[in-house]
Amino acid sequence: MSALVLSESLGTTVRQPLMRATGVSKSYGDTIGCLDVSFTLHPGEVIGVVGESGSGKSTLLNVLSAQLPPDAGTVEYDLRHRGMSDIFRLSEPDRRRLMRTDWGIVHQNPRDGLRMDVSAGGNVGERLMAIGARHYGEIRAEGLDWLAKVELDASRVDDKPKTFSGGMQQRLQIARNLVTRPRLIFMDEPTGGLDVSVQARLLDLLRGLVRELGIAAIVVTHDLAVVRLLADRLMVMRHGRVVEEGLTDQVLDDPHHPYTQLLVSSVLQV
Amino acid sequence: MNAVAKKASWDEAYNFAYLDEQTKRMIRRALLKAVAIPGYQVPFGGREMPLAYGWGTGGMQVTASVIGPSDTLKVIDQGADDTTNAVSIRRFFKRVAGVATTEATEEASVIQTRHRIPEKPLKEGQVLVYQVPQPEPLRKLEPRETETRKMHGYAEYGLMHVRLYEDISRFGHIATTYSYPVMVNGRYVMSPSPIPKFDNPKMENNKAIQLFGAGREKRIYAIPPYTRVKSLDFDDHPFEVQRWPQACALCGARNSYLDEVVLDDKGGRMFVCSDTHFCADRQEKGHRGPMAADPAARAFARSSETSEQKEDDGR
Ligand SMILES: Nc1ncnc2c1ncn2[C@@H]1O[C@H](COP(=O)(O)OP(=O)(O)O)[C@@H](O)[C@H]1O
Ligand SMILES: [Mg+2]
Ligand SMILES: [Zn+2]
């Protein structure tokens, strides 16, 4: 037991990256989406991506999560059996399998991430069934378990998400993604469009789950309060480029780039 | 039909079997591909066929493409040979292809069907043509064609079980009773067309060729003879066919698919075989159900013509 713990902690100190982006660029015609972005993400680490609207955060996230091929640059991921691999060189079925097992994607708009005509339990169970679960009782039990983890009432398990509030839909999306125990989860403005009190509760929940499960995450937001609470490290984007990066507290408390200073001061005014 | 000339036994105002040769060749190519890849939906360039609304043209086009002058055609609609649609389709092919027609399953070389598989086991050499309104079993949950195509391509079928999961969570059991999805040859999930799930087990290892035509969606698919066909289910909710506590009121069959028939406005009803030929055949062989002698029941029997014959023959 202690030997295992030791070797595991040794493994962590080696710091094998989970994902590595190198020179990632994506334009839409003449419009720059993101430009020459490079970074390394380690297992269990949470990176926040901040910047004003239009700074390229969603574009970057969509490329990293294999939803949008880049014009230039590579995105490598530590596949369970193959090690670091360029995700855009995987075959499409392999990439799709990765996206629904080892990754999770929480969309800003729950409509993009949930099946609105399928019950909450069915939404959570879908990934399990996709990887071969064929025991109804077990799938349902797991669904109920995850509803509890995201603080949704078990009595809602057979209700459709279209009857849920925005905050509940977002929590259901999280449960639906985490059920296969992914190692990496992508989130685009996870608290966007929610009331402030609902936002705070969702953030608490997310922080708890990410810490408890040791999941790595890339969280895109224009809201510095979100990354303050969730992110270990921060990347600040402007006009598609990363202008500053570092540990969250350092960047927020002692911003070096003038643009970051502006961002931080404007949030202080809010 | 009376005006048929000697050299051709069909109405020569039409090309044989109505469709032009090029169209039939195109459909046959699609059929060959479909047979080679069991359960895979092959797109084809569909044509219009003259028929009553509600029948769709997919099955008709397939039948027109496989039928030859020496074939014998049977047409069933919900198990019955004598509905308006079954009669008019039979008459149509008699006219445009000059083929013999029959109600007897064992005599037919081509059987066109909507909603049932005959009770009598099919033989090698027979062709069963299904009329299909919606070929895509995933469509209800995934409206995007690009996505369902990928799901089939990569055998990503989790969604199919989501559909069954939803059934159980709502009704306590898999409530889907027709169009019940099957896995063909361990590879493609397929809609069996709106047959009752009672008929699903008949598709497996069937000796006949099973061809499916969807006219509106322009898709053809097939199950070659002796192919594995498994109905999807859960370990703790295994697939089951419908069962009835009673036997057929007319022929006493206990292993056939029964339709409920209302006899009067006082709650009188009976359950009879949906396969009218199967039922009549059994009665002809002397099998009797509990209401076989009841005149009201006889009057309501679907295939009254055949039943009357039986009365004469049987006694
Ligand atoms: N699909 C698209 N087509 C054209 N331009 C786009 C598209 N998506 C984003 N853009 C543009 O790319 C830039 C970055 O957008 P985006 O990545 O959405 O930024 P953010 O998420 O930070 O608001 C913006 O100028 C935006 O207008
Ligand atoms: Mg965005
Ligand atoms: Zn009967």
Question: Model-flagged regions — what are they?
Answer:
Chain A
Residues S65:
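Helix-to-loop junction immediately C-terminal to a conserved catalytic motif
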Residues T74-R97:
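ABC ATPase NBD Q-loop/coupling interface
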Residues V50-E52:
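The feature captures the beta-strand-to-loop junction immediately N-terminal to the Walker
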Residues E245-G246:
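ABC ATPase "signature
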Residues K160-F164, M168:
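Conserved ABC ATPase signature
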